[in-house]
Amino acid sequence: MDLSGANTEAMLRFHRFHERFNRSIKVQAIGLGLLADEVDAGTPAETIRDRLYARPDWLWGGMPDWTNPRVEIEGALRDIGQAGVVRSFSAFDLFLDELMAELTSWRDFSSATPLDAADTPTNDDEPGDTDRVERIYTRLGASRARISDVWAVYAYFRRARNCIAHREGIASRGLVEAYVAPEIAPTLDRWIVRTGDMTAPALVAVQEGRQIAFSHRQGISASSTLRLIAIDLGRLVIEQLGERGFVYLAARRAFFDDPPLSATLEMTSMVKAFNNAMATRYRVRDYDFREGLRFLRALDLTKRCSARFAELKRRA
């Protein structure tokens, strides 16, 4: 069974967030760009207001102060960028929770030795604080070597996220230190070659005690950086799961999630639902359905999955 390109449910959900988030950020930037064009063309605020009022429920109350619309647009871009960074980390931290829960679920089922004590998210912004991702790599007994080329950028965005969430977007000393870290410049120089991304992250200079002047580009850059780390963590967890653990998780997700996967309910049999999950949703390369079903029988899950599938179809 080739799991080299496979993903678990946690990874799939984060990937879908990343794609959806990128589209959303770009749509917001397009809207502000078109508004900036109107401002540059000298379109009166009243004309813009009348257009928006023509759309039902699109604008409520009066127009914002239009004395200096360029300043308002720049502020909106900053809010999009800052909110985007926080949103990216919210999805990423959820991914970490779900990924480790998947591994813990398999270890509990297989009576394997428990992992070390669970990590806990921290809001600290001290330079010496142990990062949550770093703690997870330690729990997995794994090296961060494969993400060493993105770590400095990750640290920058993690500290920026903390400043936005807990300091109203005011840069801390820790964020400034992350920005001027000697690793940043060489990391950005080799980013495209090492990661395969089309562009390197867009970082902005920060000053302690001043607002972090992010825009939509930093929101996208943060999400792209987190995706690279998520891919590596997903790979490590799949290695620890092995074939048996991966089959167990696919079956648990396909039949025992609440609410159940919509794709499961669309199938006409338990076997088809399981094979669809393995080959399509979780992307097992050159999937051999006979091999997957052998693992399912070896785990003593065939009857349980069949009974659960029948129950789900009755309730659908």
Question: Residues of each region from the PLM?
Answer:
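Extended intrinsically disordered or low-complexity regions, especially N/C-terminal cytosolic tails and loops
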Residues: 1-106, 182-316
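Short, charged amphipathic alpha-helical segments flanked by flexible coils
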Residues: 108-124, 173-196
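A short mid-domain helix/strand-loop element embedded in enzyme catalytic domains
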Residues: 114-140
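Charged, low-complexity surface segments at secondary-structure and domain boundaries
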Residues: 141-142, 208
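Histidine-centered, metal-coordinating catalytic motifs and their short helical/loop contexts
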Residues: 149-182
